[in-house]
């Protein structure tokens, strides 16, 4: 694949988005907020606009521990929103149980499920919740984890200057691919990655496979099929798999036998993890 093609694919993945419908149950009515959100981003970044909109209905909303819910399940705001969509909502679309082009989630402001999702622990001087600070802390920790897997240590990210660290965060908030790439290339290995940071999710279960993968086997490069067959043998033991791997909402079964390192380089998320959602065939 030509470098120009890879650049184009990365740009399309970076700019991919979903339609989000946020519903607030208020008294005897349901109020809606409609927006688009980048897949390779975080739902928390939409909270300031969501809070501003719904504050007309709920007093002091910006000071409350807010959380999102989908079909009774609290949404883990620390994960990329595209991954959440594929993990929670995509199976319903593939099974024809839903046909809506937008993802409907509920905004909750009481009974925070802190045993299931990370609480927002920081507050601003005015007493409002500092959502951005919590998200920044989570993303930096994710980048440190992936950096360690890729390099064998976290030195590349820990060695970033203060200016570079600020630029990296701003590029994520602004969703600026060029600015993000210019800093992220200081984190990822210039030559060969020691291991590849991979996380595998299975809808309808709490199973999450966290697998630092060696990019090369004894004789040939490691493929995604190798990884899935090893960790999910009940789904991928046979040549004809009974499940489909989705990355960024794309059915990637055609990439099962491609080198995993190549797939990671193109499809990694902004925290440098490769997230794979495995959906059983219907």
From Swiss-Prot:
Keywords: Autophagy, Isopeptide bond, Membrane, Protein transport, Transport, Ubl conjugation. GO terms for molecular function: Atg8-family ligase activity. Transmembrane segments: none annotated. Coiled coil: none annotated. There is a cross-link at residue 144 (Glycyl lysine isopeptide (Lys-Gly) (interchain with G-Cter in ATG12)). Signal peptide: none annotated. It is a peripheral membrane protein. Conjugated to ATG12; which is essential for autophagy. It is found in: Preautophagosomal structure membrane. Belongs to the ATG5 family. Involved in cytoplasm to vacuole transport (Cvt) and autophagic vesicle formation. Autophagy is essential for maintenance of amino acid levels and protein synthesis under nitrogen starvation. Required for selective autophagic degradation of the nucleus (nucleophagy). Also required for mitophagy, which eliminates defective or superfluous mitochondria in order to fulfill cellular energy requirements and prevent excess ROS production. Conjugated with ATG12. This is Autophagy protein 5. The gene is ATG5.
